[in-house]
Swiss-Prot record:
P/Homo B domain location: 461-597
Stated role: Serine endopeptidase which is involved in the processing of hormone and other protein precursors at sites comprised of pairs of basic amino acid residues. Responsible for the release of glucagon from proglucagon in pancreatic A cells.
Gene encoding the protein: PCSK2
One annotated GO biological process: nervous system development
Record's protein name: Neuroendocrine convertase 2
GO cellular component, one term: transport vesicle
Amino acid sequence: MRGGCISQGKAAAGLLFCVMVFASAERPVFTNHFLVELHRGGEEKARQVAAEHGFGVRKLPFAEGLYHFYHNGLAKARRRRSLQHQQQLERDPRVKRALQQEGFNRKKRGYRDINEIDINVNDPLFTKQWYLINTGQADGTPGLDLNVAEAWELGYTGKGVTIGIMDDGIDYLHPDLASNYNAEASYDFSSNDPYPYPRYTDDWSNSHGTRCAGEVSAAANNNICGVGVAYGSKVAGIRMLDQPFMTDIIEASSISHMPQLIDIYSASWGPTDNGKTVDGPRELTLQAMADGVNKGRGGKGSIYVWASGDGGSYDDCNCDGYASSMWTISINSAINDGRTALYDESCSSTLASTFSNGRKRNPEAGVATTDLYGNCTLRHSGTSAAAPEAAGVFALALEANLGLTWRDMQHLTVLTSKRNQLHDEVHQWRRNGVGLEFNHLFGYGVLDAGAMVKMAKDWKTVPERFHCVGGSVQNPEKIPTTGKPVLTLTTDACEGKENFVRYLEHVQAVVTVNATRRGDLNINMTSPMGTKSILLSRRPRGDDAKVGFDKWPFMTTHTWGEDARGTWILELGFVGSAPQKGVLMEWTLMLHGTQSAPYIDQVVRDYQSKLAMSKKEELEEELDEAVQRSLKSILGKD
């Protein structure tokens, strides 16, 4: 695994974002997909070249001049590169470059077995959908739910919003999904056709996407199954799983599919959750995601929702480059009594949580939703179930305010998520330097649909985002068997420059470190305002790798709203019984946020809310800084 950089937009002022570019240590697998770039000419020329060489072709929407060639006469997965076909393309004078796509693994997450409210719904499973309205059913804790009832009573159901389910397909003929299915926004990238219907298997293993779709957009009051969180929204099927291996082209094409029609992309999959994998998006997918947040939805940005992972306490979602991306909203899960699910991974990049099952409790404590071939289920689970619930809540907020940007949605998530009655047996709830309460597993709490739509309705778009390299430590530092080296880095957060960052959103610690056993490594970072983020926890089960991390961007959301100026502290050490040793080669601090206070212009309706608290802090800070400027001016005149 190695790192790389990608530039993004004028706001970055030429800054390179450090991102993940991966090289697997495993023996490569080659697919029948090729990335082809032409010297000149458009789609017609590409179709001509492809036809002459026996390929099918698709234009890649996120890059000019790049095409996806696929050859149905080749095996979908083989150990040897097809030199004949690659050289055939490379020798064509119209072709600038041709690259056969390597295959890699992506796994569905959480695919495992396990009344009186003033809302009139006649769907038979509605009373079992405790995550929508929890009255204590299935031994749950009353009131511990997504508070969708308040949003629905305000008239918000997700109308005018389309959610794309990137998965193994959806049963769009299902009577509870058919009326809300958006065929125009759907596509099957596994079969290259516009019909993303799941491939049949005897064990129904390809029901994953259909279940996720039902959580979001199942129709209401049709006497079938249950209802979606945003039952007035449209759902699009993007079939891209269910093939021997994933490729960068298929992932990138899925993430960038119809970005002016699809508002929210929901992903309940990622690298293998085995406690030893460090993996994430490749070059094209990173480019597609950057393109999505910059250009999607007419420039407001595509909203990417990601399941944080199902590796449990033996894994860390900061080793997943999708869940830990700044461009995604990473969602964890709680069970219906507020405890953590046994499969929950914890990490500092998780923004919030929703609900799923995950302990051997009441058989009706799973997630009720649609299933294949017109059926219903009570057994959907994992963070796979959590991400679509979040996508549904975000659809309600978008209906309330279609002008919300991808960053607005993250700010709303931080400000309206609630601790409620969530309980993490391992990590305490803490407050960051500006008073925002967070947890290492649950993020800023469980989503509250009612609170989010009410705040979204009056929301003013947050100020422009800037990016600052806060500094870098380049001197190698040995990590002994015992004890933790402490490194410090003092930064002015680019103050006085056009890319000054005053109010933090995301912070990345880009780290290069060698270790005799990567899984025993623990990394913490403390901000100038005293907030400690656990960037990497021990992964005891399987991570025996000696390769360490190479320019890996560990991300934290825990310092949201803080002032980045001052001294940052990085601690590294080994946790475990066997003695280990390592060397920190590099630590670079990347700061992302705004120069002006993001909440100054927001309307406060609840004076006990996090928004009211944050706005008060901002006003006091602005006043203090104004006084300081005045004093300097007066003293300067004297």
